[in-house]
Amino acid sequence: MAKIIDHLSQGEILAQMAEEPAEAAQAALKLRRALDDSNPTPKTIPKCWESLEEEIGDVMNCIDALLLEDALNYHTFMSKCGEKAEPKMSRWKQRLKARYAKNDDDAV
């Protein structure tokens, strides 16, 4: 079977890759509305999760196409992304800890 890169330029794949996170963002916001229920949506929470999974899957497909649909390239890229994400998660937790520790001190 032909690869995506056989039909679309790298630039076109990148354009698609820019669109898909925007769609994932919309799905995430819809899920937030479903969970929060202050601004109701007709979509159920499970359907909202399904939409978010689908859009993230589209992002993953774009990454795969950009990396020439090579499993090793994809795994390497995702591993590098994970390495970059790990310290960011740690910093995020530290910021939250600092903020809520400050709020606890203010309450005393």
Question: What spans do the regions from the language model cover?
Answer:
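Flexible "arm" and connector segments at domain edges
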Residues: 1-108
